[in-house]
């Protein structure tokens, strides 16, 4: 069946087919090779892209900006302090204004309904740079990274997301694995597993793709034989430190340690993280947590020993944000 990625939104990957996702991954690989070889051709000359950031960002902003510049496009960075968005002007009206000035819009913020509203009213492609529910550009980068670090066919690659699995990373890793026919495992305390309706939807996708889905509290079952272990921060930075106690108590058994990596039984297992990671007490937040919870001085969701080991491929993963975001924009806007 033919498909056309021109003018397509990227909101969650729910509505992308397996073939379309694989096309974006192949294009990402090709664009990455061209950049390294110095043979990249600019496909987005004359294009203007708005970058709306209601949440702070390092990787997503840099990835969108560099990807756009590499391809000849111009970007405008918009944050809540420099715009009327949400204060004097609704997102619906903002979408209708920006859609008349820009060829594409990126949004990084809170509710999935906001990026959906942008897509409904902008009249131009909208790209989700992160919402509370989904992180699709990160997923493309994660799968590209796993492909690069594993000799197996995509359908034979196994990975686990471990920790607080009801966030955008847990949701999105479950979704893309189900779409692509992979062996995907989600592991965490029962209270912090993905919502049942999302799991049910992904199980339907898995039947179509041949994916194997495991959602469990059982750490040994989840990590056995996996090729990759993913995790993410345990608590959102907006939450006060005094609320962390119960969450830390729940999640401490799911901390990624050298012992956990060994429990996979796979000497080639790799560690992945969307970053930023709290792997020591060198950051302001890390120091605050270590003062209150001394047992976490050597890392929260992942220990320093794992993070600084050759098992960690999070920085290649971060670089691939740029290549995959570039592919999304080229496929939609070129």
Swiss-Prot record:
UniProt keyword list: Arginine metabolism, Cytoplasm, Transferase
Residue sites binding L-ornithine per the record: 168, 232, 236-237
GO biological process: arginine biosynthetic process via ornithine; arginine catabolic process to ornithine; citrulline biosynthetic process
Catalytic activity: carbamoyl phosphate + L-ornithine = L-citrulline + phosphate + H(+)
Positions that bind carbamoyl phosphate: 57-60, 84, 108, 135-138, 274-275, 321
Major localisation: cytoplasm
EC top class named in words: transferase
Pathway entry: Amino-acid degradation; L-arginine degradation via ADI pathway; carbamoyl phosphate from L-arginine: step 2/2
EC number annotated for this UniProt entry: 2.1.3.3
Function: Reversibly catalyzes the transfer of the carbamoyl group from carbamoyl phosphate (CP) to the N(epsilon) atom of ornithine (ORN) to produce L-citrulline.
Family as reported in the entry's similarity comment: Belongs to the aspartate/ornithine carbamoyltransferase superfamily. OTCase family.
Listed name of the protein: Ornithine carbamoyltransferase, catabolic
Organism: Haemophilus influenzae (strain ATCC 51907 / DSM 11121 / KW20 / Rd)
């Amino acid at each position: 069946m033919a498909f056309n990625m021109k003018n397509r939104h990227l909101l969650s990957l729910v509505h992308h087919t397996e073939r379309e996702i694989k096309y974006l991954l192949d294009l990402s690989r090709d664009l990455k090779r061209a950049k390294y070889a110095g043979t990249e051709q600019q496909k987005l000359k004359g294009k203007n892209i708005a970058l709306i950031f209601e949440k702070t960002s390092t990787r997503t902003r840099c990835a969108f900006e560099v990807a756009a510049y590499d391809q000849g496009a111009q970007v405008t960075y918009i944050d809540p302090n420099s715009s009327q968005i949400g204060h004097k002007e609704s997102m619906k009206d903002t979408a209708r204004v920006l859609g008349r000035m820009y060829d594409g819009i990126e949004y990084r913020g809170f509710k999935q309904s906001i990026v959906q509203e942008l897509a409904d009213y902008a009249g131009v492609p909208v790209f989700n740079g992160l919402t509370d529910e989904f992180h699709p550009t990160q997923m493309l980068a994660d799968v590209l990274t796993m492909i690069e670090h594993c000799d197996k066919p995509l359908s034979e690659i196994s990975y686990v997301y471990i920790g607080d699995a009801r966030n955008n990373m847990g949701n999105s890793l479950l979704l893309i694995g189900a779409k692509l026919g992979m062996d995907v495992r989600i592991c965490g305390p029962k209270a912090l597993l993905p919502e049942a309706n999302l799991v049910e939807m992904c199980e339907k996708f898995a039947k179509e793709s041949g994916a194997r889905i495991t959602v469990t509290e059982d750490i040994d079952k989840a990590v056995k034989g996996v090729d990759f272990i993913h995790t993410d921060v345990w608590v959102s930075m907006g939450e006060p430190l005094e609320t962390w106690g119960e969450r830390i108590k729940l999640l401490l058994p799911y901390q990624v340690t050298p012992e956990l990596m060994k429990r996979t039984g796979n000497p080639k297992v790799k560690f992945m993280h969307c970053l930023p990671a709290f792997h020591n007490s060198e950051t302001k937040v890390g120091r605050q947590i270590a003062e209150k919870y001394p047992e976490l001085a050597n890392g929260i969701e992942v220990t320093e020993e794992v993070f600084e080991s050759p098992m960690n491929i999070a920085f290649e993963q971060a670089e691939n944000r740029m290549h995959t975001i570039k592919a999304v924009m080229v496929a939609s806007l070129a």
